[in-house]
């Protein structure tokens, strides 16, 4: 392992910082609601459905609002063409807890939450002739409107739904100004299969595969020569000697534990101090890391066939001597990162974010490595617990899922942490994004990269090695993650809950069956034991 030249050392530190912020969560950036245990009784057996509330103010259509149907009441159509458009009117009294003072025939009734049961509000609105009832919540969440124990037989024949406080305030503002507000309600059905999740899965697996095979893809001749030398070194001395021109950071057992603890501290800081300026700083770090990762990838691809292009160099202030090609590529990458930063709130910004993120992760997996299965077990088992705790257990302590809140960003400013891949759900009427955190790619990616190196050094046929099977296991783990996401109605999943058993568990099982687990567990351990003061220390 070589000593660090200053620019590379600074970049490695940046990579480690961004890795600490590599969230491990698969989620859907989507509308959601607060679940409650609701009683079922005759007339109170409806499934909760998300509702689109189209609205017009003096004939001008505005952005649609989101609602949630009650467990009782009439069903809504699934397409707008089958829905009816009615004017909106506030009830009197506003809570709809007693007989209404005026008729509401041909109107959609608006009521505030509180003072009586939801079923009672619906009965009074229906008795006044309302075509539907919208209950305005006293907070931004949408709560499930169920039935009371006494509602043993309920017959409400109008649609009933809840909208958020901000949606109610927007409607109220228009109506206070004596504007004519009309509403149209329908509940679009989501597609049974989310095709964009498949694209995200391919991106994640593709990133890991490309990173693991990067040397073979960019310089196969040199890679074969390097692995031949490594194989001789391992067989004769039990040690590994990395490319002297390539900076490698091997994670140790202590470093693996420290890494997860530090990541948890970062996560809590983001949870408590999430603000636009904090996210700005992290986004700038992301841009720098992604830009340099993109530079490394573009340079490697160009030099694979055209090495002579890097011969001409130029000396620059502060930067020192660099090739003209590298300078031009840096300018292009800088322009790309700046353009994305400026346009990061646009509907197409996900493309630039994913490109920068993938470039960053491919480069990170070249810089940071696992030396053996022992360190991999410590790191991935700690990450396994870390993921489950911050997604599923943290709500019991912090009243919210810390991981999901941080991944979704600050809704008040529109800023979000960019350390995740995301793709818009093109075929979903509700829109939103499917997302996967960097951690769900980097943690298993470190293990799969180790498997690839091990297979190469041992000259394994692909079917008799570890790389192919761990890659398949990773894909299966991601499939299970999105199955869990689907079964839990889009609520964020700790992806490592599924990925770690399908990758690390599979590696251990294969090692046991092949009688190689001891070698995998202690692989390269002699290098650490024979370490001398003159040699660079592995990263802690």
UniProtKB/Swiss-Prot annotation:
<feature type="transmembrane region" description="Helical">
    <location>
        <begin position="195"/>
        <end position="215"/>
    </location>
</feature>
<dbReference type="InterPro" id="IPR007369">
    <property type="entry name" value="Peptidase_A22B_SPP"/>
</dbReference>
<feature type="topological domain" description="Lumenal">
    <location>
        <begin position="29"/>
        <end position="194"/>
    </location>
</feature>
<feature type="transmembrane region" description="Helical">
    <location>
        <begin position="348"/>
        <end position="368"/>
    </location>
</feature>
<feature type="transmembrane region" description="Helical">
    <location>
        <begin position="378"/>
        <end position="398"/>
    </location>
</feature>
<dbReference type="Pfam" id="PF02225">
    <property type="entry name" value="PA"/>
</dbReference>
<dbReference type="InterPro" id="IPR003137">
    <property type="entry name" value="PA_domain"/>
</dbReference>
<feature type="glycosylation site" description="N-linked (GlcNAc...) asparagine">
    <location>
        <position position="172"/>
    </location>
</feature>
<feature type="domain" description="PA">
    <location>
        <begin position="98"/>
        <end position="172"/>
    </location>
</feature>
<feature type="active site">
    <location>
        <position position="387"/>
    </location>
</feature>
<comment type="function">
    <text>Intramembrane-cleaving aspartic protease (I-CLiP) that cleaves type II membrane signal peptides in the hydrophobic plane of the membrane.</text>
</comment>
<dbReference type="GO" id="GO:0000325">
    <property type="term" value="C:plant-type vacuole"/>
</dbReference>
<keyword id="KW-0645">Protease</keyword>
<feature type="topological domain" description="Lumenal">
    <location>
        <begin position="343"/>
        <end position="347"/>
    </location>
</feature>
<feature type="transmembrane region" description="Helical">
    <location>
        <begin position="430"/>
        <end position="450"/>
    </location>
</feature>
<feature type="glycosylation site" description="N-linked (GlcNAc...) asparagine">
    <location>
        <position position="155"/>
    </location>
</feature>
<dbReference type="InterPro" id="IPR046450">
    <property type="entry name" value="PA_dom_sf"/>
</dbReference>
<feature type="transmembrane region" description="Helical">
    <location>
        <begin position="493"/>
        <end position="513"/>
    </location>
</feature>
<keyword id="KW-0732">Signal</keyword>
<keyword id="KW-1133">Transmembrane helix</keyword>
<dbReference type="GO" id="GO:0006508">
    <property type="term" value="P:proteolysis"/>
</dbReference>
<dbReference type="Pfam" id="PF04258">
    <property type="entry name" value="Peptidase_A22B"/>
</dbReference>
<feature type="short sequence motif" description="PAL">
    <location>
        <begin position="494"/>
        <end position="496"/>
    </location>
</feature>
<protein>
    <recommendedName>
        <fullName>Signal peptide peptidase-like 3</fullName>
        <ecNumber>3.4.23.-</ecNumber>
    </recommendedName>
</protein>
<feature type="topological domain" description="Lumenal">
    <location>
        <begin position="399"/>
        <end position="429"/>
    </location>
</feature>
<keyword id="KW-0472">Membrane</keyword>
<feature type="topological domain" description="Cytoplasmic">
    <location>
        <begin position="369"/>
        <end position="377"/>
    </location>
</feature>
<keyword id="KW-0812">Transmembrane</keyword>
<feature type="topological domain" description="Cytoplasmic">
    <location>
        <begin position="514"/>
        <end position="540"/>
    </location>
</feature>
<keyword id="KW-0325">Glycoprotein</keyword>
<dbReference type="InterPro" id="IPR006639">
    <property type="entry name" value="Preselin/SPP"/>
</dbReference>
<dbReference type="GO" id="GO:0042500">
    <property type="term" value="F:aspartic endopeptidase activity, intramembrane cleaving"/>
</dbReference>
<dbReference type="GO" id="GO:0010008">
    <property type="term" value="C:endosome membrane"/>
</dbReference>
<comment type="similarity">
    <text>Belongs to the peptidase A22B family.</text>
</comment>
<feature type="topological domain" description="Cytoplasmic">
    <location>
        <begin position="216"/>
        <end position="250"/>
    </location>
</feature>
<dbReference type="GO" id="GO:0005768">
    <property type="term" value="C:endosome"/>
</dbReference>
<feature type="signal peptide">
    <location>
        <begin position="1"/>
        <end position="28"/>
    </location>
</feature>
<feature type="transmembrane region" description="Helical">
    <location>
        <begin position="277"/>
        <end position="299"/>
    </location>
</feature>
<feature type="transmembrane region" description="Helical">
    <location>
        <begin position="322"/>
        <end position="342"/>
    </location>
</feature>
<feature type="transmembrane region" description="Helical">
    <location>
        <begin position="251"/>
        <end position="273"/>
    </location>
</feature>
<keyword id="KW-0378">Hydrolase</keyword>
<feature type="transmembrane region" description="Helical">
    <location>
        <begin position="467"/>
        <end position="487"/>
    </location>
</feature>
């Amino acid at each position: 392992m070589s000593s660090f030249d200053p620019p590379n050392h600074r970049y490695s530190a940046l990579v480690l910082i961004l890795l600490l912020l590599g969230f491990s969560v698969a989620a859907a950036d989507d509308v959601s609601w607060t679940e409650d245990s609701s009683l079922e009784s005759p007339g109170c057996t409806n499934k909760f459905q998300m509702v689109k509330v189209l609205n017009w103010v003096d004939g001008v259509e505005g952005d649609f609002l989101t609602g949630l149907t009650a467990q009782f009441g009439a069903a809504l159509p699934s397409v707008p063409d089958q829905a009816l458009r009615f004017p909106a009117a506030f009830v009197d009294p506003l809570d709809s807890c007693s007989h209404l003072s005026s008729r509401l025939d041909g109107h959609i009734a608006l009521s505030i939450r509180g003072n009586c049961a939801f079923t009672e509000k619906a009965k009074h609105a229906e008795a006044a002739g309302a075509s539907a009832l919208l209950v305005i919540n006293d907070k931004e969440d949408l709560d499930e409107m169920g039935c009371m124990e006494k509602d043993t037989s309920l017959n409400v024949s109008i649609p009933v739904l809840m909208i958020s406080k901000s949606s109610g305030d927007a409607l109220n503002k228009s109506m206070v100004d004596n504007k004519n507000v009309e509403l149209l309600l329908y509940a679009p059905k989501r597609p049974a299969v989310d095709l964009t999740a498949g694209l995200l899965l391919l991106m994640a697996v593709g990133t890991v595969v490309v990173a693991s095979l990067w040397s073979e893809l960019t310089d196969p001749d040199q890679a074969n020569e390097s692995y031949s030398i490594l194989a001789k070194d391992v067989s004769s001395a039990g040690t590994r000697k990395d490319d002297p021109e390539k900076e490698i950071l091997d994670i140790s057992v202590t470093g693996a534990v420290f890494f997860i603890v530090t990541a948890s501290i970062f996560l809590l800081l983001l949870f408590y101090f999430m603000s636009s300026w904090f996210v700005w700083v992290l986004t700038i770090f992301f841009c720098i890391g992604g830009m340099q990762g993109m530079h490394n990838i573009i340079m490697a691809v160009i030099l694979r066939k055209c090495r002579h292009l890097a011969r001409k160099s130029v000396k620059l202030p502060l930067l020192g001597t660099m090739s003209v090609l590298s300078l031009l590529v840096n300018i292009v990458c800088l322009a790309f990162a700046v353009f994305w930063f400026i346009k990061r709130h646009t509907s197409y910004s996900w493309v630039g974010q994913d490109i920068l993120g993938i470039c960053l992760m491919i480069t990170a997996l070249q810089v940071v490595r696992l030396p053996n299965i022992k360190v991999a077990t410590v790191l991935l088992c700690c990450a396994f617990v870390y993921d489950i705790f911050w997604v599923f257990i943290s709500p019991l302590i912090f009243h919210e899922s810390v991981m999901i809140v941080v991944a979704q960003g600050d809704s008040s400013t529109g800023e979000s942490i960019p350390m995740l891949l995301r793709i818009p759900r093109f075929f979903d009427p509700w829109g939103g994004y499917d997302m996967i955190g960097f951690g769900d790619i980097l943690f298993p990616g470190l293990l799969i990269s180790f498997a690839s190196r091990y297979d190469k050094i041992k000259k394994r046929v692909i079917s008799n090695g570890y790389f192919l099977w761990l890659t398949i296991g990773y894909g299966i783990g991601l499939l299970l993650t999105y199955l869990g996401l689907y079964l839990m109605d889009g609520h964020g999943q700790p992806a490592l809950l599924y990925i770690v058993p399908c990758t690390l568990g599979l590696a251990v099982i294969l090692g046991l069956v092949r009688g190689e687990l001891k070698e995998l567990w202690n692989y390269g351990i002699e290098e650490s034991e024979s370490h001398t003061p003159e040699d660079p220390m592995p990263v802690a």
